[in-house]
Amino acid sequence: MEHAATTGPRPGPPSRRVENVVLRAKDWLPGAPGGTAVWATSLEAEVPPDLALNKEQQLQISKELVDIQITTHHLHEQHEAEIFQLKSEILRLESRVLELELRGDGTSQGCAVPVESDPRHPRAAAQELRHKAQVPGHSDDHRFQVQPKNTMNPENEQHRLGSGLQGEVKWALEHQEARQQALVTRVATLGRQLQGAREEARAAGQRLATQAVVLCSCQGQLRQAEAENARLQLQLKKLKDEYVLRLQHCAWQAVEHADGAGQAPATTALRTFLEATLEDIRAAHRSREQQLARAARSYHKRLVDLSRRHEELLVAYRAPGNPQAIFDIASLDLEPLPVPLVTDFSHREDQHGGPGALLSSPKKRPGGASQGGTSEPQGLDAASWAQIHQKLRDFSRSTQSWNGSGHSCWSGPRWLKSNFLSYRSTWTSTWAGTSTKS
């Protein structure tokens, strides 16, 4: 601490105020013999020599004490100034209240005399006393003449004040009743409007509930229809697969039987015809599966659109105010989309000009030779044709029995079935002709 005091800037000489404070402190405290204060002698006696304060520290402490006293003095002055301001404000308000009371009394009396002329006013009373003091020879007759007037004024003033107050109270009551009646009318109007709004909201909620029930039922029916459609598609696919397998089996048996007969050209023609027929059937099946897939996608898209519309309706009816959207059951297009039954066979029919052109038009092979399935393949013996005819007859009977049980194995166009039956009848007639010739 001493090091800091020696190295720091040396303070200047103490001001006169500090010296006065120090002198006053010395005057207040009793001194010891020799001119030193008691607290100084006791401090010197108690504090060791190495802890004794130097003059700079003493001056610093004295300066801080003086600053504290100055701050306290400023605060005291500020407090007194605020008290004076508050008192002056109170006096001003009291004078204003008194002036307003006097003005109200003067207005109720209906006289336009100044406030100082009022005998109740302190200034008027003081002037009257001063006038009486200046005129000591004031006659008693004049005093008696003035006294009845002064004695009658308070009664008239009280009567006028009472009548004025009654009029004001009556006007205030009438005004209050008129305002209350207007408020009652306004409240009744608002109540009717609120009741109408509640009824409209209730009706809208009922309509929304009814439409939601209808929408849910339609969605349920749509889901049931989709489930039934999926089930029927699976069943149809299974039947088609079974039909294709049986047809392939019969065709390969016919080809093997023809190969066993040893007629090479006729066997090649029959094989080509059967392979072309199977390929057309496979193409028809693929086209039908693609159509069913497109129909399923369209149904799914419609379901998503319907769900979105349902959500929009719910949001529109839940929002405050009038609904922006109107739910119309007639606008729902819940009828199934028409699935086209056009297959590759119909396209070929349009291109070649007729149902029989598919079988009658020859196919160009890569080798350049035209090999086509003719309507009357020649060159087979009677035994081969008899076996082929028997196989086809068995297949036809099994197909008829399957159709009779409520199923339909033929999913292609009708003209292909008629051509197949006509081709079978042609084989039968050819076999009958060859058998008679033999």
Swiss-Prot record:
Lineage: superkingdom: Eukaryota
Keyword Coiled coil appears in the UniProt entry: yes
Chief place of localization: cytoplasm
Subcellular localization, as worded in the UniProt entry: Cytoplasm, Cytoskeleton, Microtubule organizing center, Centrosome, Centriole; Cytoplasm, Perinuclear region; Cell membrane, Sarcolemma; Sarcoplasmic reticulum
Record-level GO BP terms: cell projection organization; de novo centriole assembly involved in multi-ciliated epithelial cell differentiation; skeletal muscle contraction
Any coiled-coil regions, as ranges: 74-105, 217-246
Gene Ontology annotations for the cellular component aspect, listed alphabetically: centriole; cytoplasm; deuterosome; perinuclear region of cytoplasm; sarcolemma; sarcoplasmic reticulum
InterPro entries documented for this protein: CCDC78 (IPR039873), DUF4472 (IPR029329)
UniProt keyword list: Cell membrane, Cilium biogenesis/degradation, Coiled coil, Cytoplasm, Cytoskeleton, Membrane, Sarcoplasmic reticulum
Organ and tissue specificity: Expressed primarily in skeletal muscle.
Keyword Coiled coil appears in the UniProt entry: yes
Segments of this protein annotated with the region Disordered: 345-381
Family statement drawn from the similarity comment of this UniProt entry: Belongs to the CCDC78 family.
Function, in words: Component of the deuterosome, a structure that promotes de novo centriole amplification in multiciliated cells that can generate more than 100 centrioles. Deuterosome-mediated centriole amplification occurs in terminally differentiated multiciliated cells (G1/0) and not in S phase. Essential for centriole amplification and is required for CEP152 localization to the deuterosome.
UniProt disease link: Myopathy, centronuclear, 4: A congenital muscle disorder characterized by progressive muscular weakness and wasting involving mainly limb girdle, trunk, and neck muscles. It may also affect distal muscles. Weakness may be present during childhood or adolescence or may not become evident until the third decade of life. Ptosis is a frequent clinical feature.
Name of the molecule in the record: Coiled-coil domain-containing protein 78
Organism whose genome encodes this protein: Homo sapiens (Human)
Organism taxonomic ancestry: Eukaryota, Metazoa, Chordata, Craniata, Vertebrata
Gene designation: CCDC78
